[in-house]
């Protein structure tokens, strides 16, 4: 039985999109190791542990939001295949919570993506703002790329080049 998607708490950004692909395909795209650089352009991901994306699994990464660059640790908080995935990124002065809720809808998938970006200290906040970084830009870019990849089956390298403005 599907787990209902909770309403996002105050301060958490949510964006919705419809993907013309079944939830299993969207889930597979979200966790495809070859697609990670394209799907998460703000992250330089370290190697995953064998259990990734299972809840409790961790991995390292380098996060770049706006002008801020920080080493972070990712932790998978919840992983329900073809249904839900939540993770948190924690680094020096920054915390980013991300969530994806996949719902079978009209032969495709309704994807609700959430993000909450929290910072400590004025410098961290200013570096993100000066570079025009935000949780909204992260989540909107991610959803656009996820939709393109899941629907069109484009190779990750092609989508990554387009996202970076090189193609």
PLM region spans:
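Short, highly charged C-terminal tails/helix-capping segments
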Residues: 48, 147-167
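Short, cysteine-centered beta-strand-loop-beta hairpins and adjacent loop/turn segments enriched
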Residues: 64-70, 119-123
């Amino acid at each position: 039985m599907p787990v209902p998607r909770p309403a996002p708490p105050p301060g958490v950004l949510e964006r919705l999109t419809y993907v013309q692909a079944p939830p299993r395909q969207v889930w597979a795209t979200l966790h495809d190791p070859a697609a990670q650089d394209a799907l998460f352009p703000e992250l330089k991901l370290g190697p995953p542990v064998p259990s990734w994306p299972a809840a409790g699994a961790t991995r390292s990464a380098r996060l770049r939001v706006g002008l801020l660059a920080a080493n972070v640790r990712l932790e998978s908080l919840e992983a329900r295949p073809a249904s839900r995935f939540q993770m948190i990124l924690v680094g020096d002065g920054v915390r980013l919570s991300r969530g994806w809720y996949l719902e079978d809808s009209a032969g495709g998938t309704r994807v609700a993506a959430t993000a909450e970006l929290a910072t400590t200290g004025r410098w961290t906040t200013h570096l993100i703002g000066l570079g025009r970084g935000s949780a909204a830009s992260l989540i909107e870019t991610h959803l656009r790329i996820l939709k393109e990849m899941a629907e069109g089956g484009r190779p990750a390298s092609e989508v990554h080049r387009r996202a970076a403005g090189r193609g």
